[in-house]
Amino acid sequence: MDKKTSRLRRATRARKKIQELGVNRLVVHRTPRHIYAQVINPEAQVLAAASTVEKAVKELLKSTGNVDAAKAVGKFVAERAIEKGVTSVAFDRSGFKYHGRVAALADAAREAGLKF
């Protein structure tokens, strides 16, 4: 089993557990160059999203693949979710380690007002 398959298996296992809870989830996807975050409801509808690909976020950053970029995305997605009335979510790290950029995004979202 390769690295990607292992990550996807972990992600599927976590998503099934979150699905049983029936709560909104903050999903994170990470690539070497960018980071993406979405708040998704139990019916699989995207309520809020932010990424380093967006012009509004990219203009604030020197680089899109570092911890500072992840913090900016976490702040933006939390603000947009709160505007839609979502204050509590489950954190779905998509099988990535809770470390570095993923942890920075989560911390920034918490500081901006999301609870998880």
Curated annotation (Swiss-Prot):
Alphabetized SUPFAM superfamilies for the sequence: Translational machinery components (SSF53137)
Keyword Ribosomal protein: yes
Biological process terms in GO annotation: translation
Domain of life: Bacteria
InterPro entries tied to this protein: Ribosomal_uL18_bac-type (IPR004389), Ribosomal_uL18_bac/euk (IPR005484)
Alphabetized UniProt keyword annotations: Ribonucleoprotein, Ribosomal protein, RNA-binding, rRNA-binding
One term of GO molecular function: structural constituent of ribosome
One of the Pfam families matching this protein, by short name: Ribosomal_L18p
Family, as annotated: Belongs to the universal ribosomal protein uL18 family.
Function statement: This is one of the proteins that bind and probably mediate the attachment of the 5S RNA into the large ribosomal subunit, where it forms part of the central protuberance.
Subunit structure, interactors included: Part of the 50S ribosomal subunit; part of the 5S rRNA/L5/L18/L25 subcomplex. Contacts the 5S and 23S rRNAs.
NCBIfam families in the record: L18_bact
Protein's recorded name: Large ribosomal subunit protein uL18
Species of provenance: Shewanella baltica (strain OS155 / ATCC BAA-1091)
